[in-house]
Swiss-Prot record:
Superkingdom of the organism of origin: Bacteria
Recorded family membership: Belongs to the PlsY family.
Gene that encodes it: plsY
Gene Ontology CC terms: plasma membrane
Quaternary context: Probably interacts with PlsX.
Protein name according to UniProt: Glycerol-3-phosphate acyltransferase
Length: 218
């Protein structure tokens, strides 16, 4: 392993360890995503507790954590195998962040960013697969699982030299979703739309309650 490859792997892990969900929630005055919602510090949970705009910012930051290190390693001609290790290091940083007591998210967005750095054609296919699965099923976790299963085949078709590293990365994502896979199998996984609907209903109830209290005071 060259010094450049080793340096990029360390850099990728440190980038991944910056938990954008926790930091952005703090800046926005929102609850800690590790202690609310699903307990997962990721964009989907931030969507539940903070809304679309905050979740979108978290999603972009998580994608960039994987994209930037892998893109830099790609530009520095790091061999495909170590490029894959760089991508895995970024995801491991997101999953086990050194800056946040090694308690992180599931690494889906970061893995997506790492794969996107290899080619924009792969980005479109991955995004399309993820969105289509969510729209058809309503399960955010299923979108991530299906995308992780299909991604190696996309890479094999367009850039076969990166198939093995991407397959390793996707295995890591699937391992992080083992609880979701069990809940899906048992029919216990909650649909994303149902969670958002419940949140909207709770917000409306709180709003009505506040209005009633104000009327009483008047």
């Amino acid at each position: 392993m060259s010094a450049i490859a080793l340096g990029m792997i360390i850099f990728a892990y440190l980038c991944g360890s910056i938990s954008s969900a926790i930091l952005i929630c703090r800046l926005a005055g929102l609850p800690d995503p590790r202690q609310h919602g699903s307990g997962n510090p990721g964009a989907t949970n931030v969507l539940r507790i903070g809304g679309r705009s905050t979740a979108a910012i978290v999603l972009i930051c998580d994608v960039l954590k994987g994209m930037i290190p892998v893109w830099l390693a790609y530009q520095l001609y790091v061999p495909p195998f170590y490029l894959g290790i760089t991508a895995i290091a970024a995801c491991l940083g997101h999953i086990y962040p050194i800056f946040f007591q090694f308690k992180g998210g599931k690494g889906v967005a970061t893995a997506f960013g790492a794969i996107a750095a290899i080619g924009w054609d792969l980005t479109g296919l991955m995004m399309g697969t993820w969105l289509l699965t969510i729209l058809l099923s309503g399960y955010s976790s299923l979108g991530a699982i299906v995308s992780a299963l299909i991604a190696p085949f996309y890479v094999w078709w367009f850039k076969p030299e990166f198939t093995f590293p991407v397959a390793m990365l996707c295995c890591l994502v699937l391992l992080r979703h083992h609880d979701n896979i069990q809940r899906l199998w048992r029919g216990q996984e909650n649909r994303l739309w149902n969670k958002l609907k419940k949140k909207k209903e709770m917000t409306e109830k709180e709003k009505k309650r506040t209005e009633k209290e104000q009327r009483k005071e008047d």
